[in-house]
Amino acid sequence: MNDYLVKSIDKTKNLRLLTITAKGVVSEAQKRHDLWSASSAVLGRTLVGSLLLAGAELTDKEELTVRLLGNGPVGPAIVTATADLKVKGYVKNPHIALPPKENGHIDVKKAVGQGWFEVTKDLGLKEPYTGQVPIVSGEIAEDFAYYLTKSEQIPSAVGLSVFVNPNNSIGEAGGFMLQALPGASDALIDKTIKRINELPALSTSFLDGMTPEDLARKILGTDCKILEKDDVAFSCDCSKEKYAGILETLKSSQLKDMINEDHGAELICNFCGNKYHYTEDELKEILAKKKDDKDY
């Protein structure tokens, strides 16, 4: 099954739902960062949640960055998602595996720890906007929902799932984001939340072949309307040219050290793990552009 996101609405047009399958996205992140189980669960859920949030809120060339700033062993998770549903991200500590909980599941809450949940939106305005709430759960889905409810005043329910196989490969990944629109009654919201609470585990359902459309009908009812379906992907916009621009911001003395002592430089993208090597000659070209530097 390809990775994609579905937007739907209930028959009363008072509840909006986004559902997603994203095994390929999380698998790509797992391979690029060599993630172990707990790190995969934390980054995977944050990737899936960020795609849902981007699908719900972004248009045109807007983007958002989610920072899960926990003090647990996995460390911070940083994820950026765009309006066209491209996502990239990383965790500080990729090689974390923890003893499973009694039910056999990964202890995501322990992996995340306590701290802050931040969302920065770049909407093309002068200054990006950042909203921040405390991490209230550490299970990540509840933290997305709490952020939406408290920071953006959008009553929401979120479910996120990443199943990690014993060999650290990804068995499935997906989730949903339910948002109450202004006309939603308490009775409608309560009935829908009851449906969600009665669902089997998302991981089991996705492993059994459930699609985002199936999940939408389970949550909103079979009479819901599917509005659109969009592909999602792990994608990083880094390039050798972009990193050359970063090298140009260094002091000339630092570039000289790279040339004379290291005889080159290698830069690694945190988000995707791509490596970019610069030879002495390439560094000299960059240095030549800095002739006007006072420390040249």
Curated annotation (Swiss-Prot):
User: Per its UniProt record, what Pfam families does this chain match?
Assistant: HSP33
Q: List this protein's GO terms for biological process.
A: protein refolding
Q: How is it modified after translation?
A: Under oxidizing conditions two disulfide bonds are formed involving the reactive cysteines. Under reducing conditions zinc is bound to the reactive cysteines and the protein is inactive.
Annotated Gene Ontology cellular component terms? cytoplasm
Identify the CDD domains for this entry: Hsp33
The UniProt similarity line reads: Belongs to the HSP33 family.
Q: NCBIfam families under this entry? A: PRK00114.1
| Protein name (database record) | 33 kDa chaperonin
- The organism named in the record is Lactobacillus acidophilus (strain ATCC 700396 / NCK56 / N2 / NCFM)
The upper taxonomy is: Bacteria, Bacillati, Bacillota, Bacilli, Lactobacillales
